[in-house]
Regions:
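H/E-rich (His + Asp/Glu) clusters that bind or coordinate divalent metals
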Residues: 253-265
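An N-terminally biased module of ancient metal coordination in phosphate/nucleic-acid-related enzymes
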Residues: 1-72, 156-158, 170-226, 230-253
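Extended substrate/RNA-proximal surfaces in nucleic-acid metabolism proteins
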Residues: 51-206, 262-282
């Protein structure tokens, strides 16, 4: 059975490969399907779809929406979205403008600390991309202001650090509604990464199920076998779909490979069959 990867980022957010390069790489490693799930943007999907038409691989239009729940940043992945929907594009444009304002504030804070970050220069450097904290980290390393991306987050951009600026908060329920409004399948991204105890996780899943979540990422690059079994148990208990992916970012996450994560990731094609069945019955 072939494998798939349902969580991948391109240069249109904080990945380092273009959509076309991702499709070609996915084909070269024999993936049956790949979902392009850039942060809060669908701008890379047309290029990916066009490229995939020349290769024997299914390209799934997707997105990863950033939300907040109980003071935690939380991501909702949308699979099989209608990326041509005009209202959806308008909502994403609003999110983009909010992120722009935040990025300008982050750049200003660096300048106040004596680190000359030019946001105009960054926009040229990452032209067409949704600029995230990962881009700030890459920029600072390139300019020689810090030695590593980890240093940026440890000293400046991690939550509560001096240059961190909180984003405008969107609730997961809104992200789920947005995804379902364009025929997509909403999935909770990497739940283990939110470091919740059983009580917190149950409360979260109650809330998400109430608002129409369809599945969760039970297979993920950094999960242990125990993590994967636990997530699959939660999915089965709540009659949710299982999704999975590498969360590949290219050089921005050098220890994560497309399709295989840290070497042990395998997302079976049968997972996609069940997601398609759900999609067809919406």
């Amino acid at each position: 059975m072939k494998s798939i990867d349902l969580h991948v980022h391109s240069t249109y957010s904080d990945g380092t490969l273009t959509p076309s390069e991702l499709v070609k790489k996915a084909f070269s490693i024999n993936l049956a399907a790949m979902a392009l799930t850039d942060h809060d943007t669908i701008d890379g999907i047309p290029e990916a779809v066009s490229c995939a038409a020349d290769y024997d691989i299914e390209l799934i239009p997707g997105i990863e929406l950033s939300t907040f729940y109980d003071k935690k940043e939380m991501h909702i992945v949308g699979l099989y979205i209608d990326y041509t929907d005009k209202n959806f594009k308008k909502e994403l444009e609003s999110l983009k403008q909010s992120r722009e304002k935040r990025n300008e504030k982050i750049a200003a804070r660096f300048c106040e600390m004596g680190i000359p970050v030019s946001y105009d220069e960054m926009k040229k450097m990452y032209e067409g991309a949704v600029i995230t904290r990962a881009n700030f980290a890459d920029y600072l390393v390139r300019k020689g202001y810090v030695k590593s991306r980890n240093e940026v987050f440890d000293r400046y951009l991690g939550d509560s650090k001096p240059c961190y600026v909180p984003r405008e908060k969107m609730l997961p329920e809104k992200a789920i509604k947005m995804i379902k409004s364009v025929g997509g399948v909403p999935v909770l991204a990497h739940p283990v990464l939110y470091h919740m105890g059983n009580e917190q996780m149950n409360k979260l899943m109650d809330y998400l199920c109430e608002h129409g979540i369809a599945g969760l990422e039970a297979v993920y690059s950094t999960y242990t076998m125990g993590d994967e079994l636990e997530m699959k148990h939660i999915a089965k208990e709540r009659n949710l779909l299982i999704s999975g992916g590498s969360d590949y970012h290219g050089a921005n996450k050098p220890d994560i490979e497309l399709g295989t994560g840290r070497g042990h990731l395998f997302v079976p094609e049968e997972i996609l069959t069940k997601i398609k069945e759900y999609k067809n019955n919406i």
